[in-house]
Design a protein with these regions (language model features):
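Acyl-donor binding region in acyl/amide transferases
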Residues: 57, 70-72, 76-138
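A conserved beta-strand-loop-helix scaffold within acyl/acetyltransferase catalytic domains
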Residues: 15-96
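Terminal substrate-recognition subdomain of acyl/acetyltransferases
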Residues: 1-21, 118-145
Length: 145
């Protein structure tokens, strides 16, 4: 797993996002289906509506104009002052938005502003390694750091 040390970042929050409420959760599931279809994922991690409703979850919606086109499902863990970005989905109708990269940076800025130390992004990859503050997490050695 990789994570971002938020104190080492200086990103800005995206101008057109909102923390979503339950009225948008069905749309997020539609976006997720479009996302996995577009990406041609063969091994799909399911998302259940209850995940959106957990008290420690944030559903961050990204808009193109007034249209919800992408989201991140993230979990806040106060015990380690960290956030885990569990799921992302984007409908890819306007590829020029580059919302995957924008979401990563915007969420780093958001959670840094809220006082969190780390933003976990799941498995490492080349595009994640380009983010400021990137590091591989040796969880059992560092989970309280």
């Amino acid at each position: 797993f990789c994570r971002i040390r938020l104190q080492d970042t200086n990103y800005q929050e995206y101008h057109n996002y909102r923390i979503l409420d339950s009225s948008s959760f069905s749309r997020c599931l539609e976006i997720y289906k479009q996302y996995v279809t577009y990406k041609k994922f063969k091994d799909i991690v399911p998302i259940f509506i209850e995940e959106f409703e957990l008290p420690h979850s944030d559903v961050i919606g990204y808009y193109d104009g007034n249209d919800l086109v992408a989201f991140t499902l993230a979990y806040r863990f106060k015990s380690v002052n960290s956030v885990w970005a569990d799921q992302f989905g984007w409908d890819y109708k306007n590829k020029k938005l580059s919302l995957g990269h924008i979401a990563n940076k915007s969420e780093c800025a958001l959670y840094k502003r809220l006082g969190y130390n780390y933003y976990y992004l799941g498995e490492s990859s080349d595009y994640k390694a380009k983010l400021d503050g990137y590091e591989i997490s040796n969880f059992f050695d560092t989970w309280q750091n």
